[in-house]
Amino acid sequence: MKANRTIAKTAKPGMTLRELNDVCKKVLAEGCIRLGLIENEEEIGTYYMHSVSHHLGIDVHDVNTLENDKLLPGMVISDEPGLYIDEWEIGIRIEDDLLITEDGCEVLSEQIIRDPDEIEGFMQNR
């Protein structure tokens, strides 16, 4: 959740997907170090195998995959950090869609509940 929220707070015009991925890797690595899964940031690739973002458009994975191209207002990208921990037999991936605005971004999927307690409450009351 922290990586997902950090990307939403960080994404803005002028940034690149590579820069967003570097931010994500740092946040995920800090969490994995706290959990004792890794000893240093360079080991995060053991649990984080993909990039945090790609362009969205007509296709789910839109045509611009150049990670060094700068983001521009009006672009829509994914925010999807994921950790895959084989020894715990789990994978965790939180995904949002972000609209790049003039001064940051808007989370297009903001209304989706993601807090564990809110999800449990929703499931019990359906």
Language-model-detected regions and their locations in the chain:
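Active-site neighborhoods and metal-handling regions in enzymes and metal-associated proteins
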Residues: M1-R126
